[in-house]
Amino acid sequence: MKKLFSILSVACLTLFPSCNDWLNVTPQGQIEAEDLYTTTKGCNSVVGGIYYTLTSSALYGQTLSYGLMDVLAQYWDLSTIPDHNYYNATQYDYTDQNVIGTFNNVWSNMYQAITQCNAFIYYSEPYKENIANYDLLLGEVYGLRALAHMELFEIFGPVIHTTADLQKPAIAYRTNYNNVSQGFDTGEVVLQKAADDLNRAL
C-alpha cells in the first residue's frame, strides 16, 4: 500500500509541476492591470469604467438625477410619506443618518470617478502612440474630471452671493494620481482648474 501511495505521489508531482500556467487564465471581460493603459481596448475599458462609476445609483443613476437633488429642489412632495428614505431630506434634517449616508456616497463615488480620471491621465500618457483616438479619449477624461469637480462644488461648496464668496474654501480639486491628502481649494481656484480641464478637453 505504501509503495502504491509513493508511486501515485511521484506521478502527480511529475504530471502537474506547472499547473499554475494552465490554471491562471484571465476571465473573459477582464484585462490584466499592466495591459489596461497600454492598448486601445484597455483604455476604452478604463473610460467605460469612469462612466460606469458616474452612472451608479449613488450618482447619476439616481441621487443626482431624480433622487436626493430633486427632493431638495422640492420636485417631490414626500410630506405625507414619513417612512420614505428621503423624508428627512424634505424636512432639511441633515443630521439624519440616511441623508448623511447619501451625501457621503455622492462624495466618495464622485472622488472615485475623479481618481479613475487621474489614473487614466497618469498611466496612459507613455503609451499614447499605441492607442487609437488617444486625444479623443484624453479630452473626454479631462471633461469628465471637470464635470465631477463642478458637481461636487455645486453640492458641497459655499453658496456664492458675491465674488468674495469665491475666496472661501470649497472642495479639493484633485489633478494628481496619488493618495496624498489635499486641502480644500477656494471656489475661485476650483473654477479656474475646471476651466483649465475643459480647455484641455478641447
Predicted regions and their residues:
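Membrane-proximal, proline-rich intrinsically disordered regions
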Residues: 19-67
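Secretory-pathway/luminal and periplasmic proteins that interact with or process carbohydrate-rich
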Residues: 55-61, 75-79, 148-159
